């Protein structure tokens, strides 16, 4: 399992200007009888930076079609990539754009306050993106980021959720450039996903369902990378793990898909 720590550098400081913006605060719930606020999950800049530098080059076009508080977008721009982003939360779009303009002024970026599933702005385009990297919402509406019914975070049914993910992946496949295994040219779609446990229904691993969708769309699973997860709610479910005889899930999965001819 790969481990990423928060590095105190300029990129981290830039990301914090967005993640700590009061306009974007959406606490998941409160604990300890309402005295301790538990915030929604926040990405590590070093995690984003590693994937961006490993799978793309300076000047490449990198896209995140569910960018939230913009960690992938900011890391890509910071490392000299052109960036395209989509988010349905207007505050997210404005705050990330402001951070780009203020702290990475020479960056080339197109941020859209629109649906990252359909990506209507590029419906006539194809083979234009060097790297897709996203961190889509968890299944079963685990965390709520806005009230837009088009957002995956508001889709409580699995069939509806994965139906929209399939549409998203179909559009990403059209927009991503073609890879060539023999020539060592890789233009990946990287999707970071997790799992949810639902009592008697057991463990629901998003990677399994998304791999099946990828296979259906003739996308090749090029790699599967596990990284350490440090969930905010971890300490609150330790007793349950012992009582119900399951283990704590402290990892997420990054699925790396590519498109071959």
Where are these regions (language model features)?
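Class I S-adenosyl-L-methionine-dependent methyltransferase catalytic core
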Residues: 1-261
